[in-house]
Every structure is written in C-alpha cells, then in structure tokens.
C-alpha cells in the first residue's frame, strides 16, 4: 500500500496528544477556572471550584491531584488550591483563549448558547488559528465601519 502523502495521519486524540503540554479539555477547564477564581486572593478551594464548574467535590479532588502531579498547582487536603508558576501561565493563556473565541462568536452575533459554543470551540483550535481569530476580531474592533458592512452582507444572505 503506498502512502497517501508525505504526512502521517493520526486519530483525533493522537493529534491532541502531539500538542505541546497536552492537557485534556476537562483539565484545561479546571486550570482556567482555578485561574479565574484565584485572581482576587491568589487561591481557591475545592468547594468553590466544584460550584463554579457544576461538578461534585470528589471529582474536583481527583483532578486537582492530577494537576498537582503535573506541577501546575499546590494542594493540601482540605486546604487551598494555589497555582504554581506554570499553572498561572497556563491559566492566563486559557482565559485569554476563551475570551478571544467568545469575542469572535459575539462578532458573529451568536447569542444562543454563547458560553457552550465557546467552550466547545476553545478546546479544538491550535495557536495559529487562535492568532488568526484574534487578529480578525481586533481588525473589526478597529474598523467598525467594515464590521457594519460585514453584518449587512450577512443579513442580505439570510
């Protein structure tokens, strides 16, 4: 059997694993939320995180242990959850990614399911695509007349 091209094909999961510093989408959600909750006081707690993510505290504890093993955070049983430097960096990047995707969807006038769609998309795009989306959002933010023209164009196509 001859190869289809010079590139190797992988399953979707393997493409994700090949990404630098791979975290599962669920782990990314935890790191992002810990970052959000920790911004004011520098820490959060299991129950606060469970409430914010709509999960049970034992699920939080299990994930926190994994993230602690990855050196992204410090956690002592029944204590504070504190992001380490790599966790802070990752959390900041994840929140930025979330905000960029959300801004893009708002630019497209997505209203129904905005948070859900943002969450789905943010885990599936790479940095090159994210940078392109960020540039596009920034371009339209700085050129409101063109955004108006774009929205008029979209309206005429419906």
Regions found by a protein language model. Name each.
Residues 24, 83-84, 126:
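Residue-level signal for threonine
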Residues 1-22:
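N-terminal leader segment of winged-helix/HTH proteins
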Residues 79-98:
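Basic, amphipathic "hinge/linker" alpha-helix immediately C-terminal to the N-terminal HTH DNA-binding motif
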Residues 46-78, 85:
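Canonical helix-turn-helix DNA-binding module
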Residues 3, 122-158:
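C-terminal regulatory/oligomerization modules of transcriptional regulators
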Residues 34-38, 67, 105:
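Hydrophobic structural patches
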Residues 93-132, 136-139:
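Arg/Lys-rich, alpha-helical DNA-contact motif
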Residues 17-55:
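N-terminal helix-turn-helix DNA-binding core of bacterial DNA-binding proteins
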């Amino acid at each position: 059997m001859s190869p289809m091209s010079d590139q190797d094909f992988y399953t979707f999961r393997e493409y994700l694993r090949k990404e630098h510093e791979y975290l599962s989408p669920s782990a990314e959600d935890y790191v992002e939320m810990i970052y959000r909750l920790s911004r004011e006081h520098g820490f959060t707690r299991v129950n606060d995180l469970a409430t914010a993510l709509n999960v049970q505290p034992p699920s939080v504890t299990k994930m926190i242990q994994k993230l602690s093993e990855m050196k992204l955070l410090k956690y002592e049983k029944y204590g504070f959850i504190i992001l380490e430097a790599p966790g802070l960096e990752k959390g900041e990047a994840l929140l930025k990614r979330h905000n960029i995707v959300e801004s893009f969807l708002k630019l497209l006038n997505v209203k129904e399911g905005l948070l859900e769609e943002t969450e789905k998309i943010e885990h599936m795009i790479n940095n090159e695509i994210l940078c392109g989306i960020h540039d596009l959002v920034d371009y339209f933010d700085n050129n409101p007349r063109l955004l108006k023209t774009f929205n008029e164009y979209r309206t005429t196509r419906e």
